[in-house]
A protein has these predicted regions:
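Aromatic/acidic, Gly/Pro-rich catalytic loop(s) in extracytoplasmic/lumenal soluble domains
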Residues: 87, 97-284
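Extracellular/periplasmic catalytic domains that process cell-envelope and extracellular macromolecules
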Residues: 58, 92-96, 129
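Membrane-embedded, lumen/periplasm-facing catalytic core of multi-pass transferases
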Residues: 33-65
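N-terminal export and membrane-targeting signals
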Residues: 1-9
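Extracytoplasmic
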Residues: 67-100
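Secreted/periplasmic proteins that engage bacterial cell-wall peptidoglycan
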Residues: 58-79, 187, 199-201
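C-terminal region of N-terminal signal peptides and the immediate post-cleavage residues
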Residues: 12-38, 42
Length: 284
């Protein structure tokens, strides 16, 4: 599977030593303005939600850039301190991490350049309006190069999905088939599902129920990192679970895959890969 195997590539930035400071001046000033208390409460809630998402969804090896207050929240939530890159208010650019937590302070500091030059892709978003906090991907080559490769990136996933659908031991639901043909599925899932199908016992078949990503506010260009996977026999389902639990490095799922019942009552294995996924495969 040369085509699908070529779908994995990713670069991470370098980290710096973490140091924390108190809340920003703008946040302290807001508490004295009309409605300021409510705004502060919402700002704290948005930061906490972003920190919780980082802890539950992002690979622990990923460097994450953030302002001092946001980095403190991420550390408090459990993200490794050594992977947090603190951006002081004097930082000339937001570089240093593979992701950036774009709080209002960060958005104000870098303005429109944040998206147009450095971090074009929103992986998740919390809150709305002036208090919104976005988790953004920082591609190694910057926004222009990243956006230029998006069509090839999606086409590579489309071709990988088509190839997966030629496997007679894989039975997709209409929803899953549409997602595969639209290039919406993370390359790690494409590769893993193909491998699983080749290890099923007897005449068991792999049943693809749906692919998903529960991240709020994610860009449509972000591949789906999660899946519900069934099998035509109990032994087949057990084999799916065992295969996923045995994976390591790039193909190790985030958290433990488990068997649950889907909305129809069917037993399925749920699996999810960490963010960010391979987002530069078109240039590989």
């Amino acid at each position: 599977m040369v085509l699908v195997s070529a779908l994995v590539a990713m670069a991470l930035g370098a980290g710096v030593t973490l140091a924390f400071t108190r809340n920003t001046v703008s946040e302290r000033t807001a508490s004295t303005a009309p409605g300021g208390s409510s705004a502060i409460t919402q700002a704290v809630a948005n930061r906490q939600a972003a920190a919780a998402w980082i802890v539950s969804q992002v690979a622990r090896s990923t460097y994450v850039s953030c302002d001092p207050t946001m980095c403190a929240a991420a550390q408090s939530a459990g993200y490794p301190v050594g992977q947090l890159v603190v951006l002081q208010s004097t930082a000339p650019d937001p570089l240093g991490g593979a992701l950036i937590i774009a709080t209002p302070a960060i958005q104000s500091q870098f303005g429109s350049r944040l998206a147009s030059v450095y971090a074009p892709l929103v992986l998740a978003s919390f809150g709305s309006g002036a208090g919104r906090v976005d988790i953004r991907y920082i591609p190694p080559g910057g926004t222009k190069a990243f956006e230029g490769q998006l069509p090839a990136d999606r086409q590579a996933r489309i071709e990988g999905g088509k190839q997966l659908l030629t496997n007679k031991r894989i039975q997709p639901s209409p929803t899953a088939k549409g997602q595969l043909l639209a290039g919406q599925v993370d390359p790690r899932l494409l590769i893993t599902l193909s491998a699983i199908a080749g290890t099923l016992p007897g005449k068991a078949e792999l049943e693809l129920v749906a692919f998903d990503d529960s991240s709020p506010g994610a860009s449509p260009d972000v591949p789906l990192r999660g899946a519900e996977i069934g099998a035509s026999t109990p032994a087949g389902l057990s084999a799916v679970l065992a295969f996923l639990k045995a994976q390591q490095t790039d193909y190790a799922p985030a958290g433990q895959p488990v068997i649950v019942k889907d909305k129809s009552g069917q037993q399925v294995v749920t699996v999810r890969y960490a963010a960010p996924g391979p987002l530069d495969v078109g240039s590989s």
